[in-house]
Every structure is written in structure tokens, then in C-alpha cells.
Curated annotation (Swiss-Prot):
It holds the Pfam family Urocanase_C. One of its GO terms (biological process) is L-histidine catabolic process to glutamate and formamide. InterPro entries: Urocanase, Urocanase-like, Urocanase_C, Urocanase_central_sf, Urocanase_CS, Urocanase_N, Urocanase_Rossmann-like, Urocanase_sf. It catalyses: 4-imidazolone-5-propanoate = trans-urocanate + H2O. Binds 1 NAD(+) per subunit. It comes from Staphylococcus aureus (strain MRSA252). This is Urocanate hydratase. The gene is hutU. GO terms for molecular function: urocanate hydratase activity.
């Protein structure tokens, strides 16, 4: 085992900045400030890994250092399997993680292959090397809670209490996103180290293991109308039950535990983290049974809060499906966050555009933020987000920024970043990527594509087409994964990263990739019949051959 740190500075050890960018983002994924369990190559989300094992990690490193600027490395589930000569505008790396033939696309078969060292769970940005810590999800979480506030609480979360669980790499964004919307958050996690990490990075305000103290603090902050986040150490099922018994009013209920993975992501009721680890290794079958039974109880408690007046939504971890499979027939009585709050943004090709400064210099991100303000002065949501981010976001690993931008905006920003690198206003190349959770890059019937207007929730073609078009357009590294977010059998999704190194070649590639990528989001929603997407496509001149047949489904 090695201790990995994000590499910074202007000297490179690869044969070009593009290969160097891949290496630095791989290191960044495993930086101790960023990854959840770097010693096990686990970045976030249960067992979402950056490489299959340490031997494969070192082979990836070596290959990247030797890779020519007209070659492409192929990575199969975290292991480098081939290098081929391609051309300078082709991707330097193509990645496929955790992809199983549908009949075998389940956790049991995955775990068998994993034990044999034949596969790796890449989550979304873990195995595609573009994870930037909790900031990567915090704006999406902020926008979700902002829209919830607009729909249910007169535009703001002041005077409300949200109860949730899970403070890992994804769930860790919740406390900050809620307080950014002036709400009070009680965030439960059985693993105290996770609470400590969110306190250390200033995503969470206070830690306690005492429920009465947590409720008192929450009530006082609610009465003052102030934002406050409380990391409450304990088991979610136990604590949710106790809160119901005390009759404490919860206004919003959700969950972001790693429920997508019953074996590695969720701790059953009645077990400490240490006890769970022992049982997981000793009797994995029993562990999964207990874990799923706890999830069923967890969802029943969420439904009870909902019945008592709380706004309830699923935050994309597939916990409703597990509960439904274990006898909770009304598990889907509350919606997922995408159909409830996010889909209109997807129809415009908006999604989690992100970039990282390979120099390691925060001033490069400051200059990029300044440029973003100049380019989009009319985008009030974006400007408000940048104000909050500059005030409240602590960088983890390489300095980075997340900013939800739409079709046209992403290409405009990418070209501007390339120009700033070329002119020396930004000191080193910038890596531009996104989460796989995006407008046109994922098929996930219990999350991103839940309740599609035309019933096409489970159609996986769009994620495949996204990876193909971004490869054709010349992304720097392109990935295709299975099972991210919601677990084996429930999702297919693609990722892209493109490097702005200041060159004319980068300019061509940026313009293509940052147009095709969000364009796929618009196309996907046009095809499903969404009027906002149809209007966007017509206004932006996106060529959709059968657009006049859309919108009548």
C-alpha cells in the first residue's frame, strides 16, 4: 500500500500534458484529502475504486508515463489491458468498468468475479478519475434543495429541519447544501470517521452522538431561522425511530447512505462499524439479509415521516427498490430527486460541469471563476452559487470548481479556459469533466431516468451513444460504467474528460466535446417528448432528424 498525494506544479513526468492530466487526476482521486479509503483504492460510494488492485494501479502509472501522444490505453475494470496507436485527437484513455451481461448483472455475480480479481466497481467518477471530493456533488445537492424550497417552503429552507443519513463522499454534501439554503440539517452516520471528515472540511458544523442534544440544537436554530448542520453519530434506523417516538417535527426526509451496495455500503441495525466488518467477512450472505431488512425498516420510517407531513424524496441510492424487494409495497410512494426537482435542467442540457487546476494553485480557479462571471452575467443562479462556493467550499486535493452549465455554455467556458491557459493567465492546463449523473449520459430507472414521459426509463442506448460520440469528438479520456449510484443491474452510464492545454488542437476538441456531450442530454429528452428540450433544440439549432414527431407522446 502507498500513500498517494495529488501532484502539483508545472514540471511533468509524462510525454505530454494530456497524459500528465490523466495521471494527476488518478492521483487526485486517491489523495487522502479526497478518497474515503485510499489504502484500499476506494474513492467513494461503498467500494467505488480507482484501480482494481495496487499492481494494476502501478501498471496504469507506468503506462501513462510511457504513453505517446498518438496512442490510446484501454482500461478494463481498473486494469490496463492494451495500448494501441490511434491519433493525436483520439482519447488517450478509454475505460470500461463493472459492465456485465444483463442476465448476470447482479451483486452476487459481481462479488464472485471481484473475489477472483476479474472486475472492479468503478461507481461513477471513482473509476473514471474525475472525482473532486464532496464539492463535485454539492452544487447539484444545493440546487435540489433550492428547488424543493421553491416548491414547498416559499423559496427558502429557513425554519425547516431536514433529516437524512449518510455522510460519505456523496452524502457529505448534504449538510453544506442545506445550510446554504438556510435550513437545519440532522445528518446521521454510523461511522464517526465520516462525520469527522465532514467537520474537518467544513461541510458540517457540529458533531454529537446524543440525540436529545441534536434535537435541541436543531429546534433552536429552526426558531432563529438560521442554517445549522448537525452530524449525529448512530444507526439511522434506531435514530429515525427514536425521533418519531419523541414526536419531533421533521420537515424534509431523505437518505444518502450507500444503500446501493447491501454488502459493502450499508451497516445493519444493531451492528457497530467494527462488528459489521467482522460479519461481512465471516458470513456475507447473512450480512446482506440483515442489511436489506434494515433498509426495509429505514424506508418504512421515511414513509411514516412522509405520512406525518414531511416532504420525502429518494436521493438516488436505490433504497426504495431494496425495500420494495423486501416487502415494502408502498416504497415508491415518494419520488426520486430527478423527476421531482432536476429534470427541467436536464432538458436544457444543464448538468455538473466541473474543472480542476492541474497546477495545484487556487489562483487558477479564482481566475476561472472571474471569467465565468464575465461570460454569464445574466445567470443569477450561477453567480449566487459562485458567491457561496468561494465563501464556503474547501478544496480537497487539486483546487477545482463545479458549476452547472447548459448547452452552449459548457463549450463557451471550455474555450475561455483554454484561452486563459494559452495566454498564461492560468498557470497550467485545466481538466474539464463532469459527473456521470448528467442530462444525456445515464440510464437509471430509479434515479436519472425515473418516470420518463414516454416510459423509456430503462433504455440504455443513450449512455452508450454518449460514450461513442464523445470518443468520436475527441475527449481526452472517456468511460462507460455499470451500476454506479444505484448498484448492479440498475444503471448504465458514461463519463468524459477533456484537457484545456492552451493549444489549437485542444480548442478544436473542446468545442466538439463540450457541444456533443450536453447535446446528447437535449436529444435524449427531445426523444422522450419533453417540450423544454424540443424548444431548446430548436433555439440552439441542434439537428434532431425527427424533432417534429416529438412532444406528442
Amino acid at each position: 500500500m502507498r500513500k498517494i498525494q495529488a501532484k502539483k506544479g508545472l514540471s511533468i513526468e509524462c510525454k505530454g500534458w494530456e497524459q500528465e492530466a490523466v495521471l494527476r487526476m488518478l492521483y487526485n482521486n486517491l489523495d487522502t484529502e479526497v478518497a474515503e479509503r485510499p489504502e484500499d483504492l476506494v474513492v467513494y460510494g461503498g467500494i467505488g475504486k480507482a484501480a482494481r488492485n495496487w499492481e494494476a494501479f502501478e501498471a496504469i502509472e507506468k503506462t501513462l508515463r510511457e504513453l505517446e501522444s498518438d496512442e490510446t490505453m484501454l482500461v478494463q475494470s481498473g486494469k490496463p489491458v492494451a495500448v494501441f496507436k490511434t491519433h493525436e485527437e483520439a482519447p488517450r484513455v478509454l475505460i470500461s468498468n463493472s459492465v456485465l451481461v444483463p442476465e448476470w448483472a447482479n451483486w452476487d455475480h459481481f462479488n464472485e468475479l471481484d473475489k477472483k480479481g476479474l472486475i472492479m466497481y468503478g461507481q461513477m467518477t471513482a473509476g473514471s478519475w474525475i472525482y473532486i471530493g464532496s464539492q463535485g456533488i454539492v452544487q447539484g445537492t444545493y440546487e435540489t434543495f433550492a428547488e424543493l424550497g421553491n416548491q414547498h417552503f416559499n423559496g427558502d429552507l429557513a425554519g425547516t429541519v431536514t433529516l437524512t443519513a449518510g455522510l460519505g463522499g456523496m452524502g457529505g454534501a448534504q449538510p453544506l447544501a442545506i445550510t446554504m439554503n438556510h435550513g437545519v440539517a440532522i445528518c446521521v452516520d454510523v461511522d464517526e470517521t465520516r462525520v469527522d471528515k465532514r467537520i474537518a472540511t467544513k461541510y458540517c458544523d457540529i458533531k454529537t452522538a446524543n440525540l436529545d442534544e441534536a434535537l435541541k440544537l436543531a429546534e433552536e436554530a429552526k426558531e432563529r431561522g438560521e442554517g445549522l448542520s448537525i452530524g449525529l453519530v448512530g444507526n439511522a434506523v434506531d435514530l429515525h425511530q427514536a425521533i418519531l417516538e419523541k414526536g419531533f417535527k421533521i420537515d424534509i426526509i431523505t437518505d444518502q447512505t450507500s444503500a446501493h451496495d447491501p454488502l459493502n455500503g450499508y451497516v445493519p441495525q444493531g451492528y457497530s462499524v467494527e462488528e459489521a466488518k467482522v460479519l461481512r467477512e465471516k458470513d456475507p450472505k447473512k450480512y446482506v439479509e440483515l442489511s436489506q431488512a434494515s433498509m426495509a425498516k429505514h424506508v418504512e420510517l421515511m414513509l411514516e415521516f412522509h405520512k406525518r407531513g414531511a416532504v420525502a424524496f429518494d436521493y438516488g441510492n436505490n433504497i426504495r427498490q431494496v425495500a420494495f424487494n423486501n416487502g415494502v409495497r408502498n416504497a415508491f410512494d415518494f419520488p426520486g430527486f430527478v423527476p421531482a426537482y432536476i429534470r427541467p435542467l436536464f432538458c436544457e442540457g444543464k448538468g455538473p460541469f466541473r474543472f480542476a487546476a492541474l497546477s495545484g494553485d487556487p489562483k487558477d480557479i479564482e481566475r476561472a471563476d472571474e471569467e465565468m462571471r464575465k461570460l454569464f452575467p445574466e445567470n443569477e443562479k450561477l453567480l449566487r452559487w459562485l458567491d457561496l462556493a468561494e465563501e464556503k467550499i474547501s478544496y480537497q486535493g487539486l483546487p477545482s470548481r463545479i458549476a452547472w452549465l447548459g448547452y452552449g455554455e459548457r463549450a463557451k467556458m471550455g474555450l475561455a479556459l483554454n484561452r486563459l491557459v494559452r495566454d498564461g493567465e492560468i498557470s497550467a492546463p485545466i481538466v474539464i469533466g463532469r459527473d456521470h449523473l448528467d442530462a444525456g449520459s445515464v440510464a437509471s430507472p430509479n434515479r436519472e431516468t425515473e418516470s420518463m414521459k414516454d416510459g423509456s426509463d430503462a433504455v440504455g442506448d443513450w449512455a452508450v451513444l454518449n460514450a461513442l460520440i464523445n470518443t468520436a469528438a475527441g475527449g481526452s479520456w472517456i468511460s462507460f460504467h455499470h451500476g454506479g449510484g444505484v448498484g448492479m443491474g440498475y444503471s448504465l452510464h458514461a463519463g468524459m474528460v477533456v484537457v484545456a492545454d492552451g493549444s489549437e488542437r485542444a480548442e478544436r476538441r473542446l468545442e466538439r466535446v463540450l457541444t456533443t456531450d450536453p447535446g446528447m442530454g437535449v436529444a435524449r429528452h427531445v426523444d422522450a417528448g419533453y417540450d423544454i428540450a424540443i424548444q431548446t433544440a430548436k433555439e440552439k439549432g441542434i439537428h434532431i432528424p425527427m424533432i417534429d414527431k416529438a412532444g406528442d407522446k
